[in-house]
Amino acid sequence: MSQKDYYEILGVAKNADAKQIKKAYKRLAMKHHPDRVKNDKASAEKKFKEIQKAYAILSDVQKRQAYDQFGHVGGNANVGSAGGNPFGGGFGDIFGDIFGGGSQQSNNRGSDLRYDLEIDLKKAAQGSTVKIRIPKNETCDTCSGIGAKSGTNVKTCSICSGVGQVQTQQGFFTVQRPCGTCSGTGQKIEFPCGTCRGQGLVRKQKTLSVKIPAGVDTGNRIRLSGEGEAGTIGSSSGDLYVQVHVKKHAIFEREDNDLYCEVPIDFATAALGGSIEVPTLENKLKIKVPSGTQTGKLFRLRDKGISHLQRDGSGDLICQVKIETPVNLNKKQQDLLQKFSSSCGKKHHPESDSFFDKMKSFFG
């Protein structure tokens, strides 16, 4: 028996846009829903199932393209239910596509993929765009994912009637399984496509541009919708998840959005004060060091850290000075330091004198 044209079922033209198709479906679904029809429930259920199936095909870009090219065989792959209650979860489930929610996605949706991306701290801090290459299954261009040789027919599986699923009754429960005859495809291909050998999918290397937002850190992941494995005909592709790993930096340590670094300074600069250069992710900056600076003193440079991921502004750069003790002194330098040390009194080393005074009182 010939099947009705899906466009005729919904009462729309073949060039109707998505908005027109959805409007027609909503109107017809409301009119013919079995819960709203008082008489002849069986006919209402049949009509409603017909409307629902037509909308499932024409509202999906890939399914509609396959239907336009191959007719009912191309569009029907993995759509609908085989026997049992055609209304699944009831009124709310059926109208899920109109009012939100709805049934679980087809099992033939493409798998999600993961790509581990290592970037340096500067790219993580400031944002960047990087190119990656991933191996993935994509829809065969030769047969548009149908799996059949061009110009040949694809037969509907006689066991599952093209649905790809069969239902069996076990006591009070109905169990649904993939059809063993067609391996869940809903179709029988007599003359396979020479490119994909009837699979509808081909393995390719694809280059993608990934936008890295400023402020990402190790553990963050970026989702690229539809860039996972391609689904079988009529089913959506999976997603690609890019897992970010930030390399350890030679100078900076990161804590949230702040950067820390240790800056060595010489004894004279620490004692007398002066200017020193400190690194940032972009360039070098000069900061003033006051006289009498001690090891461990912190200098905070506002907004010179990592950009915030979800708001404006950046963290800070915190530089900790470390006074470097001179080494490899010659005799003259040693004598000069000795004279300098002898000339210093308690007021020049207040912390040392305070410490030794405490020691004396402690030991009596």
Curated annotation (Swiss-Prot):
Belongs to the DnaJ family. The J domain is necessary and sufficient to stimulate DnaK ATPase activity. Zinc center 1 plays an important role in the autonomous, DnaK-independent chaperone activity of DnaJ. Zinc center 2 is essential for interaction with DnaK and for DnaJ activity. Its cofactor is Zn(2+). Pfam families: DnaJ, DnaJ_C, DnaJ_CXXCXGXG. NCBIfam families: DnaJ_bact (TIGR02349), PRK10767.1 (NF008035). Participates actively in the response to hyperosmotic and heat shock by preventing the aggregation of stress-denatured proteins and by disaggregating proteins, also in an autonomous, DnaK-independent fashion. Unfolded proteins bind initially to DnaJ; upon interaction with the DnaJ-bound protein, DnaK hydrolyzes its bound ATP, resulting in the formation of a stable complex. GrpE releases ADP from DnaK; ATP binding to DnaK triggers the release of the substrate protein, thus completing the reaction cycle. GO terms for biological process: chaperone cofactor-dependent protein refolding; DNA replication; protein refolding; response to heat. A zinc finger (CR-type) spans 127-205. Zn(2+) 1 binds at residues 140, 143, 193, 196. Zn(2+) 2 binds at residues 157, 160, 179, 182. One of its GO terms (molecular function) is zinc ion binding. This is Chaperone protein DnaJ. It comes from the Bacteria. The keyword Ligase does not apply. Homodimer. It comes from Ruthia magnifica subsp. Calyptogena magnifica. Binds 2 Zn(2+) ions per monomer. Keywords: Chaperone, Cytoplasm, DNA replication, Metal-binding, Repeat, Stress response, Zinc, Zinc-finger. GO terms for cellular component: cytoplasm. Residues 5-71 form the J domain. Coiled coil: none annotated. CXXCXGXG motif repeats lie at residues 140-147, 157-164, 179-186, 193-200. It is found in: Cytoplasm.
